[in-house]
Amino acid sequence: MLKGQLAGLMKQAQAMQDNLKKAQDELALIEVEGQSGAGLVKVLMTCKHDVKRITIDPSLLADDKDMLEDLVAAAFNDAVRRAAATSEEKMGKLTAGMPLPPGMKLPF
């Protein structure tokens, strides 16, 4: 009986590993957009933090360079937060019901 339980646990662990890999692959394809300056600067990135595009409204190009740099940084940070929230939501569905310690995130 113990051998059967161990085999079942190993099968569950393998299925979980496969599901995590699939979720990670899906996250690499999901794109989120961060914005700043009421949408004047936008950063499009995947949930794996690969930046795909930065869009800057032409009206900002004649403005202060420091302000533009701040807006780009703010849009990037907004995109990172959105990617993290999307990743957490996606992975949370996989780990629902698992006895993980508080604050522990998957993948490790």
From Swiss-Prot:
User: Pro residues bias located where?
Assistant: 99-108
For this UniProt record, give its keywords in alphabetical order, as a comma-separated list: Cytoplasm, DNA-binding
Which stretches of sequence are listed as region Disordered? Answer: 86-108
Q: Which GO terms describe its molecular function?
A: DNA binding
Gene3D superfamilies (alphabetical): Nucleoid-associated protein YbaB-like domain
> Where is it found, in Gene Ontology cellular component terms?
bacterial nucleoid; cytosol
The reply on keyword Nucleus is: no
Q: What is its main location?
A: cytoplasm
TM ranges: none
Q: Domain of life of the organism in this record? A: Bacteria
**Chain's role:** Binds to DNA and alters its conformation. May be involved in regulation of gene expression, nucleoid organization and DNA protection.
Instruction: Please give the subunit comment from the record.
Output: Homodimer.
Which HAMAP family has this protein been placed in?
DNA_YbaB_EbfC
Q: Which family does it belong to?
A: Belongs to the YbaB/EbfC family.
Task: Quote the protein name from its UniProt record.
Answer: Nucleoid-associated protein Mpe_A2533
Q: What is the lineage of its organism?
A: Bacteria, Pseudomonadati, Pseudomonadota, Betaproteobacteria, Burkholderiales
